[in-house]
Amino acid sequence: GEEVYYVYYYDTTNEDSSVSSVVASLDDKVYRVDLHDDFNSNFVGEPSGVVNNISDLKVKSPTVIKVESESIIAFFSGSEEIKIGLK
């Protein structure tokens, strides 16, 4: 099958435990990106939603994206949307 994975963008200094537990329960691989780290600040901005090019991606904390075959297929922004979208 095609590789499916998630990327969890969040501020490690202000993590929502209810979101973390939903993310931790996912069956597919999850990559975590710390938005508190200046190295990742290029991702932060007005949430872009699903984009074709990862370089156009903008997120706020917390956000989860779902990636399949190198394409973003879902974008969940904010804790409520993540919890509803991933459960």
Each language-model region and where it sits:
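Short acidic, S/G/P-rich loop/turn micro-motifs used as interaction or catalytic elements
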Residues: 11-15, 37-40, 72-73, 81
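An anionic, turn-rich surface loop/hairpin at beta-sheet edges
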Residues: 35-56
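Local sequence-structure signature of Cys/Sec-based thiol-disulfide redox active-site neighborhoods
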Residues: 1-32
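Small/flexible residues
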Residues: 31-34, 68
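Non-catalytic, surface beta->alpha helical segment in thiol-disulfide oxidoreductase systems
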Residues: 58-87
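Short, surface-exposed loop and linker segments with low hydrophobicity and enrichment for Pro/Ser/Thr
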Residues: 1-4, 52-58
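Surface-exposed alpha-helical segments enriched in charged/polar residues
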Residues: 21-24, 55, 84-87
